[in-house]
Amino acid sequence: MNKKIGAIGEQLAVHYLKNKGYRILDCNYRTRLGEIDIIAILNDTIVFVEVKTRSSGAFGTPSEAVNYKKQMTIRRVSQQYLLSNRIGEDDWNLRFDVIEVQLIEKKYKINHMENAF
């Protein structure tokens, strides 16, 4: 996937989440283990979001790219985020979401899957 398309999708996802009342903590959080696209808070829940963007259906739906291996990577990176920011898991609910962004000409469609894994 083109990095530019991915960046556009992530920007649209951040805008979408803010409009839904989420507070964005971090974007593109990277460790040696991997990356989480968006980390946000909604009420008493820390939400780790994987954003998948497609400009065509040639590679299937965006969420199909979030396989078991990718899920485990996101879980490991989320643990690193919590540790490095001294956030206790007992203090917050944790959730793992996937946001699909489909770019169609000059329009887009967002599908937000809460508790995706």
Curated annotation (Swiss-Prot):
InterPro entries: Restrct_endonuc-II-like (IPR011335), tRNA_endonuc-like_dom_sf (IPR011856), UPF0102_YraN-like (IPR003509)
Gene3D superfamilies assigned to the protein according to its UniProt record, in alphabetical order: 3.40.1350.10
GO MF annotation terms: nucleic acid binding
Any one Pfam family match given in the protein's UniProt record, by short name: UPF0102
Stated family: Belongs to the UPF0102 family.
PANTHER family linked to this entry: UPF0102 PROTEIN YRAN
Cross-referenced NCBIfam families: PRK12497.1-3 (NF009150), PRK12497.3-3 (NF009154), YraN family protein (TIGR00252)
Protein name: UPF0102 protein Clos_1471
